[in-house]
Design a protein with these regions (language model features):
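Non-heme Fe(II)/2-oxoglutarate
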Residues: 1-81, 104, 111, 127
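Catalytic core of non-heme Fe(II) oxygenases with the double-stranded beta-helix
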Residues: 73-147
Length: 147
């Protein structure tokens, strides 16, 4: 069965120390996302939690471009709709204490065709990417709050 969302409560025993560690890192990587990121900091224990949670029964390369990276964003960072065409799953772990209720991650459907992921049609996918900054072309279908 394909799951859309998996929520893991209390992911870290001491999230405050992880947050302190994250804030002490160098943030210099920017890309197709708001804010800035660090180099990856994947640990064996985090890898095991993720592997067990999403039932990975094959070897997965956690040494990829962003696995385990910390990302720093502020209220001033502009967000947009985007997808990663080569990614089968994504994980987001919030470390902001007392975050505003409006923070979190939204999931959208492209109004033209109802797509929630890339189609595999290069021309259509390029068009969808081109529309990523025009929120009138998207419908928010759900949101995962920063709690």
């Amino acid at each position: 069965m394909n799951k859309s969302f998996i929520c893991i409560d209390d992911f870290y025993e001491d999230p405050d120390s992880v947050r302190t560690f994250a804030l002490e890192q160098e943030y210099e990587t920017s890309g197709n996302y708001p804010g800035i990121r660090t180099v990856p900091h994947m640990t064996d224990s985090v890898e095991k939690i993720i592997t067990d949670a999403i039932n990975l029964n094959q070897t997965y390369n956690f040494n990829g471009q962003y696995c385990g990276s910390f990302q720093y964003t502020t209220a001033y960072d502009r967000s947009w709709v985007h997808a990663d065409g080569t990614t089968e799953w994504a994980g987001v772990l919030y470390l902001t204490p007392d975050a505003p209720p409006s923070s979190g991650t939204g999931f959208f459907k492209f109004k033209e065709g109802g797509y929630t992921r890339y189609t595999g049609d290069k021309d259509m996918d390029k068009y969808i990417d081109k529309c990523s900054q025009d929120l009138t072309k998207w419908e928010k279908i759900t949101e995962v709050a920063n709690v």
